């Protein structure tokens, strides 16, 4: 998927859907130094561009670009 600038409405929606403390798991990341698929993390914040900044369980801090990368929130059973 092509990276495009998000609207303010889209950024606010991401911020509301992924507040600080949300647990996520990465499916795929489009980056030369990508975090490995299956890595879990905790959302620290969503920036003004709509990028999600998790603290990955493996110690990495690379941001997710929602319109390019694939991830999901962990279910209650997975926590």
Question: Where are the predicted features?
Answer:
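Basic/aromatic-rich interaction segments and small domains that mediate binding to polyanionic partners
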Residues: 2-79
